């Protein structure tokens, strides 16, 4: 096998059971409708347990009380997580009021969880409320279709409130890409919205009868911001503008962060540059990338099924040539672009249309009424009077967008009274965690519940070493699936067991380098002792403007990951 074509285009062998399930599901229907009426269990049975993921839901249970319920001979306290499809994170205030009401009245936890994929999740939906949540979303023009499992997930778009025209154009493309790659099956409408079954055969011209080999993630990125972390995604359209107007995209393919502890066949990978394309080819190219991965992705091993592994197996040039063939185009050379940061600018920013945008820091994206900080009530009050929209960011924050000067003081007053504008350190603003315990079935260690007190300790270290005005991009993910995007952080903690994490160092501020494991299976005191020493060295030895991650590489503390498929585990 030569370098250009290092491996087979299609992996032969026994297909995974997930492939059987999809094939037999009758285009994602399964027996979900019948299962809904089974009151003997709070969960979904058999294939339906996995099929509901295509409808935007995961079956979970409260792991804090799992053992206690088992002792009482009770089944786990099953409840669903539902994730909304919300391209670019834009939600109207009318929609916000509807989701606020549902969260308060029909979920166990009463919260709205903003995610780092620019949407919101409900946690703790009991089976009896599953159909009503889909109907509520539909009534305000939303849905949960294709936000989980083997499809193109929620499409991200840079939350850029400064260049309003460019953002508007990029956002429209994010919506178009999302719509174009949606499944065509009528299963969602039939099961949840009671729409009549039509006497036609379902067809999936893009996704195919067995859909994609694995999850697939897409972004639209507006440099110089990399807030959406493009290298965590399968397909990325980097906006190229001339005179403030969008003219085309650079395409980058094959990013992804999920690994498995100890499995050296798995690795995080940054996306590869394919080339530049004019706007009119965007949908054809998006479809070509997806169908190439559909046909060439590994359906015999789900741990090796994502686009990043397909690219490494067949070769970047081979994959790129196939995309060109299917789309009927030739990529132009990559146009120049650069990233300067990926954090949100917290507070007020004036847009070019004389409207104001207020970015609110929401720790871990969890919107709830806390003692003395009624965040959820405050946002509801703002939603009732605000004429613009809300935008969820990929950093789990919320932008009150398009505020006229005349409304600014009123909205700020509510935000301040609700604790939505409490001062936080730059370090806290640049730290993030996935949900993890108690609801995530894959969690190995705490993440969301661990982060606030952990950052208290990091803030103390930053103050001790005189760098409180600085920040380190710091992320915690409860398991190596990597939802917290720790594998693109300057300091990444990956859960290994309760109270234990792998410590990764050497990523950079702009999110273009994968960090390497520095220490394995260590406790919080060990993490803090390590970081105390390293932050102290960074404070004294850094060069002007040098971020912590770049410093750890330059100082020889960690070797940079240059080719993750080959050297991540070295």
Curated annotation (Swiss-Prot):
Component of the sulfite reductase complex that catalyzes the 6-electron reduction of sulfite to sulfide. This is one of several activities required for the biosynthesis of L-cysteine from sulfate. It comes from the Bacteria. Its EC number is 1.8.1.2. [4Fe-4S] cluster binds at residues 434, 440, 479, 483. SUPFAM superfamilies: Nitrite and sulphite reductase 4Fe-4S domain-like (SSF56014), Nitrite/Sulfite reductase N-terminal domain-like (SSF55124). It is an enzyme of class 1 (oxidoreductase). GO terms for cellular component: sulfite reductase complex (NADPH). Keywords: 4Fe-4S, Amino-acid biosynthesis, Cysteine biosynthesis, Heme, Iron, Iron-sulfur, Metal-binding, NADP, Oxidoreductase. Its cofactor is siroheme; [4Fe-4S] cluster. GO terms for molecular function: 4 iron, 4 sulfur cluster binding; heme binding; metal ion binding; NADP binding; sulfite reductase (ferredoxin) activity; sulfite reductase (NADPH) activity. Alpha(8)-beta(8). The alpha component is a flavoprotein, the beta component is a hemoprotein. It comes from Escherichia fergusonii (strain ATCC 35469 / DSM 13698 / CCUG 18766 / IAM 14443 / JCM 21226 / LMG 7866 / NBRC 102419 / NCTC 12128 / CDC 0568-73). Binds 1 siroheme per subunit. Binds 1 [4Fe-4S] cluster per subunit. Pathway: Sulfur metabolism; hydrogen sulfide biosynthesis; hydrogen sulfide from sulfite (NADPH route): step 1/1. InterPro entries: CysI, NiRdtase/SiRdtase_haem-b_fer, Nit/Sulf_reduc_fer-like_dom_sf, NO2/SO3_Rdtase_4Fe4S_dom, NO2/SO3_Rdtase_4Fe4S_prot, NO2/SO3_Rdtase_4Fe4S_sf, NO2/SO3_Rdtase_FeS/sirohaem_BS. This is Sulfite reductase [NADPH] hemoprotein beta-component. PROSITE patterns: NIR_SIR. Pfam families: NIR_SIR, NIR_SIR_ferr. Belongs to the nitrite and sulfite reductase 4Fe-4S domain family. One of its GO terms (biological process) is cysteine biosynthetic process. The keyword Cell wall biogenesis/degradation does not apply.
